[in-house]
């Protein structure tokens, strides 16, 4: 399949429905079927999603139930796992139950880990995997500076496609630098994949004031649809990923993309107004990717604690934020943090997690 002809909505397999801390297979099957029946077929997974269970679930809910040529499957290699890349790739094929990946990405490249990917000859490895027919296309997901991105793409023309984090609140974020990354990708004329278009749900669960602005402009569409359409309207964007957890989210997203319409001038003005308001709210820019949890020696549920903090700041259902904090910290509270900074070293958003946990202690434990 040509990369500029991928379906517009990609199914991110990192926030699947759960029951009793396990992926709900039956609900996931229902979502897969509804997505496929809508004529969409792009599935994105990774080695550590759902603590390593995402790939095996794909085998059960997708690979065993649909012909191989009916879907486009994407997986990624994470250098930070410190495992042999050939062993990881072999494990991924076995977990997913496939003989090849339609697209394989070097996962989460940034300024601080590029040298590791280079040292392990990962770019040359990708070329070899493609020659062997084990992958159809080769690319990378990226979280670094525009300058380093430009250097990588100039040095490695074998990169066919790049996945970046982009949403309307991060376009001019000095840490994320989505606008600069997008401009570099346009310079190299590469197709673009978008992750975190709704910023882990932050741009779907907005304050009442912001919600009213969106609803005044168009009362018939969801808040999330604005963020998805913003990302999908940008030049060279071929697929926008959404980590969907419910059939309701899926149906809403399908509705957004089934007869997709790019944002018009007036809608961009609404987005600009909302962006200015959101910046004043100073919410924690967590996307609930959960990378921080896997390496935390205290097993602190950092994303859920941050959800409680954000809810408190928005002053929506204030007592519910305290109740949520109590529920998600039954085993380990924010005060259990030993300040090892393991979480901060793997956070794609480069958040000052320790400081925010200290804030949670002040807000919820005093």
Regions found by a protein language model. Name each.
Residues 42-49, 74-75, 136-140, 163, ...:
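Short catalytic-loop micro-motif centered on adjacent basic/acidic residues
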Residues 53-64, 83-97, 115-124, 144-157:
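Distinct, well-ordered alpha-helical segments
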Residues 14-26, 74-84, 112-115, 210-219:
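Active-site mouth loops of central-metabolism enzymes
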Residues 109-287, 291-300, 304-307, 315, ...:
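Beta/alpha (TIM)-barrel catalytic core signal, keyed to glycine-rich beta->alpha loops juxtaposed to Asp/Glu
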Residues 2-5, 36-37, 59-70, 90-99, ...:
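Acidic (Asp/Glu)-rich catalytic clusters
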Residues 1-71, 125, 131:
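N-terminal binding-site loop/beta-alpha segment at the start of enzyme catalytic domains
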């Amino acid at each position: 399949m040509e990369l500029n002809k991928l379906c517009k909505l990609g199914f991110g397999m990192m926030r699947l429905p759960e029951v009793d801390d396990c992926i709900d297979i039956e609900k996931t099957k229902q979502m897969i079927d509804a997505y496929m029946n809508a004529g969409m077929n792009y599935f994105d997974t990774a080695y550590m999603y759902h603590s390593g269970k995402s790939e095996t679930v794909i085998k059960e809910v997708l690979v065993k139930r649909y012909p191989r040529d009916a879907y486009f499957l994407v997986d990624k290699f994470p250098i930070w796992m410190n495992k042999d890349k050939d062993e990881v790739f072999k494990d991924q094929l076995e977990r997913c139950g496939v003989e090849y990946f339609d697209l394989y990405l070097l996962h989460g490249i940034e300024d601080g880990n590029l040298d590791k990917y280079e040292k392990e000859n990962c770019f040359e490895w990708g070329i070899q995997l493609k020659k062997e027919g084990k992958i159809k296309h080769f690319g990378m997901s990226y979280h670094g500076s525009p300058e380093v991105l430009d250097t990588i793409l100039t040095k490695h023309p074998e990169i066919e496609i790049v996945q970046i984090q982009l949403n309307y609140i991060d376009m001019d974020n000095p840490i994320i630098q989505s606008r600069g990354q997008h401009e570099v990708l346009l310079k190299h004329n590469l197709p673009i994949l978008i992750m975190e278009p709704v910023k882990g749900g932050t741009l779907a669960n907005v304050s009442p004031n912001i919600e009213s602005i969106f609803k005044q402009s168009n009362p018939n569409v969801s808040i999330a649809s604005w963020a998805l359409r913003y990302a999908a309207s940008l030049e060279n964007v071929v697929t926008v990923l959404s980590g969907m957890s419910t059939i309701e989210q899926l149906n809403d997203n399908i509705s957004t993309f089934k007869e997709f319409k790019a944002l018009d001038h007036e809608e961009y003005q609404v987005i600009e107004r909302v962006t200015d308001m959101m910046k004043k709210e100073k919410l924690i820019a967590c996307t609930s990717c959960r990378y921080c949890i896997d390496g935390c020696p205290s097993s602190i549920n950092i994303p859920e604690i941050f959800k409680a903090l954000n809810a408190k700041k928005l002053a929506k259902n204030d007592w519910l934020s305290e109740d949520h904090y109590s529920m998600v910290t039954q085993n380990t509270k924010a005060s259990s943090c030993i300040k090892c900074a393991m979480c901060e070293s793997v956070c794609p958003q480069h958040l000052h997690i320790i400081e925010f946990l200290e804030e949670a202690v002040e807000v919820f434990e005093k």
